[in-house]
Amino acid sequence: MSNEKVALIILDGYGIGEPNGGNAIYMAQTPVMDRLLQRWPHTKLSASGLDVGLPDGQMGNSEVGHTNIGSGRVVFQDLPRITKAIEDGTFFENPVYAAALDNAANGKALHILGLLSDGGVHSHIRHIFAMVKMAHDRGIQRVYLHCFLDGRDVAPTSGAGYVRQLRDYCAELGTGKITTLQGRFYGMDRDKRWDRIEASYNAMVCGEGIQDPDPVHAMEASYAAGVTDEFVKPVVCVPDGRIQSGDSVIFMNFRPDRAREMTYALTQPDFDGFRRKTVAENLHYVCTTRYDEKLTDLPVAFPPEELHDTLGEIVSAHGLRQLRIAETEKYAHVTFFFNGGTETQYPGEDRVLIPSPREYPTYDLIPEMSAVQVKDELVKRIRTGTYDMIVCNFANCDMVGHTGVMSAAIQAVECVDRCLGEVVAAAQEMGYTLLVTADHGNADRMVEPDGSPNTAHTTNLVPLVLVGSDLPLRPCGRLSDIAPTMLELMHIEPKPAMTGESLIEKS
């Protein structure tokens, strides 16, 4: 049987929200999507929480969404993966953590670094507690905690409460001292603002900063000065708790981007971001996840799970041609993340990057972004008849949704709808079956209940419309079901690793 041609069109940030004035998708004129929903089989997909490998109730995002779509399975993300390890006890047996604690047991200190909150974006306080418990259970005597304060992913003055929790937990166990405090502004920079990293480094390695033996008092003093958690200036609470040569250091953040610079400053002999007054050499340094592929000398407690037999890999193995196309903002999502977190470009896989507009500071000023250019190039490629599978992302509903500007979000939705109309027409003309869907919601809720702008993703379901086929669909599913559906349409058997289920109703 010959392979059917299939195109997947991902409308980023296009969720199914309440039919009200705060929903840009509902308020927009969308004649194309309306027509598709009226004519073709469609269903609703879960794109958040446990259904995409995130904690229950947590909104999805583009990275997670595309990984689940492209791999055809629920891929547990770092936060629930580590939390699950704590719950089943494997965290406390992790050989990478254990080796660092063994080093500390031989006369060295253990330093635990991490963002102290339950925001769940970069870290989780529960994971820090678990590391203190592991150190206690293994009899580590000198345990020093270097706490970055949040104030972005949680309330701006919630830090004092987290500091109290950690202080009390350490006192209860008789293990660990809060040694330094500082806002994430300093120790978690990601934009090579090395003066910030230097101030943080000097507190942890040199003992320089505001001196206050009481971490809770230090927080209250910062608030009294009008400085909230994110911007708390480095405080040293335990002067003899400096990071010194040969010590063990465990960075508990699981999100790499804001852990990378500090890791380089603490570990790399050729680091040149600033002149280090003191260098702590031969640290037994552990990254909780892989912070940078270049840091090959550092052990990783939870290395990335390798995803094999993804949609792109299977299609390539059948000798078929595929196209990935998006503008800059979502290009990594239809390539790197869609392929399971690997830079590998499979045989027969072509990639097209359309530049996102750079001359505007925010996308509410250009809600069409580069959608028209993406559409034009996609239609041109469709008409060649070259590709057996196409994956395209339109970024607008997500990126403009993030601005919180309702009028711009409506324009973004309408622009995407017009582009979708031309893509569908060309694809049907060339014999493609299309799946029109989204990776998560955003523009479907632009306004909070109190009337303030909502700039975040939503936990709403997302649509999936099967255009060009009257095969009946299951009434609900999740993002990981898209890949097996596409393979069924292409008459290709999925691999066992692809645990998602086809959305096509079994007769």
Where are these predicted regions, by residue range?
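Feature captures the catalytic ectodomains and active-site-proximal regions of enzymes
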Residues: 1-507
